[in-house]
């Protein structure tokens, strides 16, 4: 539904040049729109409280999140709820509830077999509401396990709107359609239409925010065809997620199934890989149906495992990787009019090239990412605050950023 408006580009360049003569030389935010990067609460304040709970989202907002992220799956009675996966045997206390013991089964999702598990589509919303959410990552607080319910999308939206009024700042939501190909099969098996999952999301968001690209909402997915479909149904901002299996010693990305390509591509025996999506040609393709990309962070900053113990702790691990700088993906994405929101930053894991989580985030912010997903909202907020920004210059440029943002339109499919 959107495509670039090229007439604005000369205007923006001329205005920027004029401003540069009026303001002392300085660096503003190197983001697509010139505004400060977003801090996106990955699954809520999941570093502190059980993920995808209203309490976790509220905590993230209290810590300063700009957006909260509900991953979405669907119940047996067609309600969209927030869970990271359709699999709920480990993220809830369902295994301890005898009345649901007969729901344990084995299913395959995106080529991966889940044995002796419980699946959200086998429960009604009323049944899910009797479960309690649990912490899913080892080493994190567990004292709240079982205390918080699984929220619906409607409840997440209501929370964001209420907190926006309470705090006086706009709190957005960043829903992800989880495993769309799988959920389309679920929809059909339950008697709903093939695109019910996507259509239900769109109708819910339009009712809450309207059909506009300025809504405080992003819709994200690792698949392609569902985003292309959504591009024909909504003006709400769309984000193509980009995955990989691992990062190699030389800094390249390992592409091993099922993390080598979007699953809707895989089921058609297509050749398009995730790495292809962040090539120059791939980014041009993504710009025809989406507004931004959400790549795993090693796609953006090259780090190399060269065997040097840089932290001096006697163990050579990911934190010791040599940082070689930008891969160029951010710059190329911006050149294609795409913003870049990267993931996932954690205080307790997954640091590459840094032994301080805030410093790692700062490195990506300085490269120009437009947003960061983190389990620890407070660290993300501190990282944004720590990156210098001349206020006067930034405010002037933010006005130009709005012009550029409004001028960009996705191609109509």
Predicted regions and their residues:
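A short, hydrophobic C-terminal helix/tail in secreted or cell-surface proteins
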Residues: 388-408
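Short alpha-helical segments used as structural interaction elements across diverse proteins
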Residues: 6, 39-40, 405-407
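Gram-negative bacterial Sec-dependent N-terminal signal peptides
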Residues: 1-27, 400-402
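Phosphate-group recognition and catalysis centered on beta-loop-alpha active-site segments
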Residues: 15, 26-386
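Short, charged juxtamembrane terminal tails flanking transmembrane helices
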Residues: 410-413
């Amino acid at each position: 539904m959107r495509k670039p408006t090229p007439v604005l580009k000369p205007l923006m360049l001329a205005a920027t040049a004029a401003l540069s003569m009026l303001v002392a030389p300085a660096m503003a935010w190197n983001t697509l729109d010139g505004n400060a990067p977003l801090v996106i609460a990955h699954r809520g304040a999941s570093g502190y409280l059980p993920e995808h709970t209203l309490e976790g989202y509220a905590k993230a907002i209290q810590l300063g999140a700009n957006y909260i992220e509900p991953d979405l799956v669907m119940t047996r009675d067609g309600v969209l709820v927030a869970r990271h996966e359709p699999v709920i045997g480990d993220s809830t206390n369902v295994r301890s509830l005898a009345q649901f013991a007969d729901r344990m089964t084995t299913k395959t999702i995106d080529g991966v077999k889940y044995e002796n598990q419980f699946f959200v589509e086998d429960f009604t919303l009323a049944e899910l509401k009797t479960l309690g959410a649990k912490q899913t990552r080892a080493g994190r607080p567990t004292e709240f396990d079982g205390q918080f319910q699984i929220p619906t999308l409607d409840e997440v939206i209501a929370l964001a709107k209420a907190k926006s009024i309470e705090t006086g700042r706009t709190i957005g939501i960043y829903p992800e359609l989880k495993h769309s190909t799988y959920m389309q099969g679920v929809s059909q098996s339950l008697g709903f239409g093939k695109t019910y999952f996507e259509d239900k999301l769109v109708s819910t968001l339009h009712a809450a925010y309207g059909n506009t690209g300025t809504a405080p909402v992003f819709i994200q997915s690792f698949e392609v065809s569902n985003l292309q479909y959504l591009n024909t149904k909504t003006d709400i901002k769309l984000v193509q997620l980009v995955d990989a299996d691992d990062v190699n010693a030389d800094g390249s990305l390992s592409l091993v199934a099922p993390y080598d390509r979007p699953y809707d591509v895989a089921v058609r025996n297509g050749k398009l890989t995730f790495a292809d999506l962040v090539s120059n040609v791939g980014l041009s393709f993504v710009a025809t149906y989406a507004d931004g990309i959400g790549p795993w962070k090693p796609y953006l900053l090259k780090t190399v495992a060269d065997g040097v113990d840089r932290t001096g702790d006697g163990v050579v691990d990911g934190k010791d990787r040599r940082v070689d700088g930008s891969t160029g993906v951010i710059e190329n994405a911006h050149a294609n009019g795409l913003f870049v929101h990267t993931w996932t930053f954690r205080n307790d894991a997954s640091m590459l090239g840094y032994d301080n989580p805030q410093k790692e985030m700062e490195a990506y912010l300085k490269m120009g990412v437009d947003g960061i997903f983190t389990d620890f909202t407070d660290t993300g907020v501190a990282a944004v605050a720590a990156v210098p920004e001349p206020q006067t210059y930034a405010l002037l440029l933010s006005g130009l950023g709005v012009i550029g943002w409004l001028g960009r339109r996705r191609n109509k499919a």
